[in-house]
């Protein structure tokens, strides 16, 4: 079990002192990969994924047996600005759908053999409208981080985090804009499907929020412009690092949460891979800024952890080949 988060300074220190991969396990995995019954590099990126996974799990011949998918839900005061095509009550309704097994992520988690958990964060108390005030107080940010931090099962061996929150592409765009600059329009997309006028309004809201909150510190950006579910995802990603659990990032909103961590500690995302590139236009740019090449690009724009869950079976396949294939010596095959 991880210690509870007591304050933001402690969280910042934990990010800075996070453990790295096991060098011996990684070296052992690289050596094993060179002995498997295939031409060098024939499995392409699957080989890299298996070696990366082995290093983080501290096992040169690992298995993936206990993946966990966590969906965090939150509501946003900035929806008062008309940034979403859907009303905020949909968040509550979708949480019920998750709990009853009726959402896309339920099916995808089940297909991947993953445990799925749902955490709703004070849905009856939205964050503040960030065009008027910081989205959260320091205590509220800490509570959201702690929710994610405590949600990770220490027995899990792979983690996907997802979200549900009407309007949450707006804070995600604001976080990306604050951290990486450019114009608000570079980071703002249609989300759940706003029209041209809605997109112009949403872009204005992002620009106003970033102009109002001038700090570019990762945790301050998360506090002033983020949301509870976005902060909870960040907390879960950080907890997984402490536990050496590899993480598959989902779409634009999840990646924005991850970017806030990377702004605090440069290597904070070394234990993560990008599950997919979503249809939200700025996601590709954000992934490039973080140096993450997506495993999939299927035009998804659902959220919920859906793209990350789809990528579980890619990572499972990579590890299965690495750990299950015979070596040339074992198979009695000449390696040339």
Swiss-Prot record:
The active site is at residue 304. It catalyses: 5,6-dimethylbenzimidazole + nicotinate beta-D-ribonucleotide = alpha-ribazole 5'-phosphate + nicotinate + H(+). It is an enzyme of class 2 (transferase). Gene3D superfamilies: 1.10.1610.10, 3.40.50.10210. Its EC number is 2.4.2.21. The keyword Disulfide bond does not apply. Keywords: Cobalamin biosynthesis, Glycosyltransferase, Transferase. One of its GO terms (biological process) is cobalamin biosynthetic process. GO terms for molecular function: nicotinate-nucleotide-dimethylbenzimidazole phosphoribosyltransferase activity. SUPFAM superfamilies: Nicotinate mononucleotide:5,6-dimethylbenzimidazole phosphoribosyltransferase (CobT). PANTHER family: NICOTINATE-NUCLEOTIDE--DIMETHYLBENZIMIDAZOLE PHOSPHORIBOSYLTRANSFERASE. Catalyzes the synthesis of alpha-ribazole-5'-phosphate from nicotinate mononucleotide (NAMN) and 5,6-dimethylbenzimidazole (DMB). NCBIfam families: cobT_DBIPRT (TIGR03160), PRK00105.1 (NF000996). This is Nicotinate-nucleotide--dimethylbenzimidazole phosphoribosyltransferase.
């Amino acid at each position: 079990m991880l210690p509870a988060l007591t304050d933001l300074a402690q969280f910042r220190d934990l990010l800075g002192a996070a453990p790295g991969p096991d060098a011996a396990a990684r070296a052992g995995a690289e050596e094993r990969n060179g002995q498997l019954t295939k031409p060098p590099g024939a499995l392409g990126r699957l080989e890299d994924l298996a070696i990366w996974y082995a290093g983080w799990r501290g096992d040169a011949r690992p298995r993936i047996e206990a993946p966990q998918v966590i969906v965090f839900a939150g509501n946003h005061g900035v929806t008062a600005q008309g940034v979403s095509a859907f009303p905020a009550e949909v968040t509550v309704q979708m949480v019920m759908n998750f709990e009853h097994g009726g959402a896309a992520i339920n099916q995808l988690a089940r297909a991947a053999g993953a445990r799925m958990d749902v955490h709703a964060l004070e849905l009856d108390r939205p964050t503040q409208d960030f065009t008027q005030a910081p989205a959260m107080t320091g205590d509220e940010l800490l509570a959201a981080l702690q929710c994610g931090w405590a949600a990770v099962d220490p027995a899990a061996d792979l983690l996907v985090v997802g979200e549900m929150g009407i309007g949450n592409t707006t804070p995600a765009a604001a976080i990306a804009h604050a951290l990486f600059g450019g114009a608000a329009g570079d980071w703002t997309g249609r989300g759940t499907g706003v029209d041209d006028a809605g997109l112009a309004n949403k872009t204005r809201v992002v620009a106003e929020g970033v102009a109002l909150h001038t700090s570019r510190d990762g945790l301050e950006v998360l506090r002033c412009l983020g949301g509870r579910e976005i902060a909870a995802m960040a907390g879960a990603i950080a907890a997984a690092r402490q536990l050496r659990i590899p993480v598959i990032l989902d779409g634009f909103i999840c990646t924005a949460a991850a970017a806030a961590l990377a702004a605090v500690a440069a290597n904070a995302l070394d234990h993560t891979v990008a599950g997919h590139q979503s249809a939200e236009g700025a996601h590709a740019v954000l992934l490039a800024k973080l140096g993450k090449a997506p495993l999939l690009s299927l035009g998804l724009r659902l959220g919920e952890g859906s793209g990350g869950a789809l990528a579980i079976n890619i990572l499972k396949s990579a590890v299965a080949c690495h750990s299950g294939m015979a070596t040339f010596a074992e198979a009695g095959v000449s390696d040339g």
